[in-house]
Design a protein with these regions (language model features):
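Short basic helix-loop element that most often maps to the first helix and adjoining turn
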Residues: 12-31, 56, 61
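Recognition helix of helix-turn-helix/homeodomain-like DNA-binding domains
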Residues: 32-47
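Short amphipathic helical patch at the helix-1/turn junction of helix-turn-helix
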Residues: 8, 19-20, 48
Length: 71
């Protein structure tokens, strides 16, 4: 699996979890100290997500990091 495919899978998983919780992109962005554009980029797999950001996303979505990257 390529890095691009992994980024897209990660983004899709984050988007699905966010939508399950009824969180708008803007609110998730505020929760992790980011902005809506960055959340859109993450969810569409166009940016790399570092460990610190991955941890903040997992905390905000109330899941374990492994739940985001289990692919």
């Amino acid at each position: 699996m390529s890095t691009d495919e992994r980024r897209k899978q990660l983004g899709a998983r984050i988007k699905a979890l966010r939508e399950q919780q009824g969180l708008p992109q803007r609110k998730l962005a505020l929760m992790i100290g980011s902005n809506q554009t960055h959340i859109w980029q993450i969810e569409n797999g166009t940016v790399n997500v570092g460990l610190d950001l991955l941890c903040r996303l997992a905390d905000a979505l109330e899941v374990n990091v492994r739940d985001l990257i289990d692919f």
